[in-house]
UniProtKB/Swiss-Prot annotation:
The keyword RNA-binding does not apply. The lineage of its organism: Archaea, Methanobacteriati, Methanobacteriota, Stenosarchaea group, Methanomicrobia. This is Ribonuclease P protein component 4. It comes from Methanosarcina mazei (strain ATCC BAA-159 / DSM 3647 / Goe1 / Go1 / JCM 11833 / OCM 88) (Methanosarcina frisia). InterPro entries: RNP4, Rpr2/Snm1/Rpp21. It comes from the Archaea. Keywords: Cytoplasm, Endonuclease, Hydrolase, Metal-binding, Nuclease, tRNA processing, Zinc. GO terms for molecular function: ribonuclease P activity; zinc ion binding. The gene is rnp4. Binds 1 zinc ion per subunit.
Length: 107
């Protein structure tokens, strides 16, 4: 297979993988109130897809997943969001771990 065709096929597979991750993300969001375990399973599938295809999880999805127990985080349901000294601190209510994301203060 020529190099250009191989690259085109790889791009197609990566696009399909990203679309599937977004679809699973939406399903996890819908399933969380009724069935949290199924929601966690969808998050695990997102991680498996990204590892299998060696692509990173999109930032919008990654920020809604606990980095320790891989549960889907929803503010007010199973996560606590706080602003603390230039950081957004997200506390997972399932495992109790905290994730810190910096933000830029407006002058």
């Amino acid at each position: 297979m020529p190099r250009a065709a191989r690259k085109q096929q790889k791009n197609l597979i990566q696009n399909i993988a990203v679309q599937r991750m977004w679809r699973l993300f939406e399903r996890a969001k819908v399933e969380l109130p009724e069935n949290p375990e199924r929601s966690r399973h969808y998050v695990q599938l997102i991680r498996n897809i990204s590892m299998r295809n060696r692509i990173s999880i999109p930032r919008e999805i990654k920020s809604r997943i606990c980095k320790h127990c891989y549960s889907f985080l929803t503010p007010g349901y199973n996560a606590r969001y706080r602003l603390n000294e230039g950081f957004v601190v997200i506390t997972c209510e399932h495992c109790g771990k905290e994730m810190r994301y910096p933000y830029k203060k407006l002058k």
